[in-house]
């Protein structure tokens, strides 16, 4: 127990020795944690620049958990219970090994409060661990940087599920009006990855929920996107994947078979079967057919189309054919 307390105390003193604590003297200029490259960590990747007039820098403080509120731009909506339990246990044993990042925010009664920029998971775990105060770096962060900072922290920690990551990418594209290529270069991700992740938002909502819950992987979801059918068929295949435990490869094969069937049905619907024209009925045709049948001693059919007619003489064998030819020759002579 003593060892744990020493670890906690040592960590706090180490951070405090590196980062200034307490209020900042306005005349002496802001105390900063490391080199100032911008108001936020995202400035380095997204391309922002700090304005000298409102640059506040970063200050280390121990802040009451009750004075901190959530990040409204937090892209992550699902906090894994098992991972959270492990973090809570670690905090109880060793303390919080990394401070969270917050920004000043006025309370409802004018009191000083703080809003999380990075570290909401650590803040939640500290509450569950029974801590009253939490180490934090207080840093001025604009509203337009809240989502960027939270997204960068989460994707580089691999904590977002595929749907949360896709929604965050889409929000960045909408808010900052950049292309997929520009966003990829600024956050250190490949353009195909961003494009493929955003495509997941086209899945039916029930399928999206299963991806967010981790029941379906991003690979399964991308395979379902290739299904050339209505959303109901995608949902049915998603249920089959879960029930049968299909691999991504097996899902891709199932999608190929389904697409082949859909294309076959579409061809049958689009290409009408040509209807046979009914022969023109004229008085006397049947009489001619009967007379020829009697003459050749075989079945003879006579039909008349729109432009031309046709006589069909049946025979049962080569000898029978020769017999009919002989009869025709006799009539000719």
Curated annotation (Swiss-Prot):
GO molecular function: DNA binding
CDD domains per record: SPO0J_N
SUPFAM superfamilies xref list: KorB DNA-binding domain-like, ParB/Sulfiredoxin
Alphabetized InterPro entries for the sequence: Chromosome_partition/occlusion, HTH_ParB/Spo0J, ParB/RepB/Spo0J, ParB/Sulfiredoxin_dom, ParB/Sulfiredoxin_sf, ParB_dimer_C
Alphabetical list of Gene3D superfamilies matching this protein: 1.10.10.2830, 3.90.1530.30
Transmembrane portions of the chain: none
Keywords of the record: Chromosome partition, DNA-binding
Family recorded in the similarity comment: Belongs to the ParB family.
Xref: PANTHER family: CHROMOSOME-PARTITIONING PROTEIN PARB-RELATED
Record's function text: Involved in chromosome partition. Localize to both poles of the predivisional cell following completion of DNA replication. Binds to the DNA origin of replication.
Name this protein carries in UniProt: Probable chromosome-partitioning protein ParB
Organism: Mycobacterium leprae (strain TN)
Gene: parB
């Amino acid at each position: 127990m003593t060892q744990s307390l020493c670890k906690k105390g040592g960590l706090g003193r180490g951070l405090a020795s590196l980062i200034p604590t307490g209020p900042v003297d306005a005349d002496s200029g802001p105390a900063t944690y490391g080199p100032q490259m911008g108001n936020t960590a995202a400035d380095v990747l997204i391309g922002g620049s700090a304005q000298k007039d409102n640059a506040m820098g970063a200050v280390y403080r121990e802040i009451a958990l009750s004075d901190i509120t959530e990040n409204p731009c937090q892209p992550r909506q699902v906090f894994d219970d098992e991972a959270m339990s492990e973090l809570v246990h670690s905090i109880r044993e060793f303390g919080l090994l990394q401070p969270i990042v917050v920004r000043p925010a006025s309370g409802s009664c004018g009191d000083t409060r703080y809003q999380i920029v990075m570290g909401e998971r650590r803040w939640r775990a500290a509450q569950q661990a029974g801590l009253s105060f939490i180490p934090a770096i207080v840093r001025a962060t604009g509203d337009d940087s809240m989502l960027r900072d939270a997204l960068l922290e989460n994707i580089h920690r691999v904590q977002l599920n595929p749907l949360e990551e896709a929604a965050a990418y889409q929000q960045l594209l909408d808010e900052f009006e950049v292309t997929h290529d520009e966003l990829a270069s600024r956050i250190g991700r490949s353009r195909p990855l961003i494009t493929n992740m955003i495509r997941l938002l086209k899945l039916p909502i029930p399928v999206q929920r299963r991806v967010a819950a981790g029941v379906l992987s991003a690979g399964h979801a991308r395979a379902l996107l290739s299904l050339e059918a209505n959303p109901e068929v995608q949902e049915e295949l998603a249920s089959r994947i879960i029930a049968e435990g299909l691999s991504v490869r097996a899902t891709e094969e199932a999608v190929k078979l389904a697409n082949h069937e859909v294309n076959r049905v579409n061809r049958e619907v689009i290409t009408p079967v040509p209807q046979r024209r009914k022969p023109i009925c004229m008085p006397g045709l049947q009489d001619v057919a009967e007379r020829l049948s009697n003459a050749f001693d075989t079945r003879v059919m006579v039909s008349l189309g729109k432009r031309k007619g046709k006589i069909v003489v049946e025979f049962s064998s080569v000898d029978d054919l020769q017999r009919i030819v002989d009869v025709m020759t006799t009539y000719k002579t």
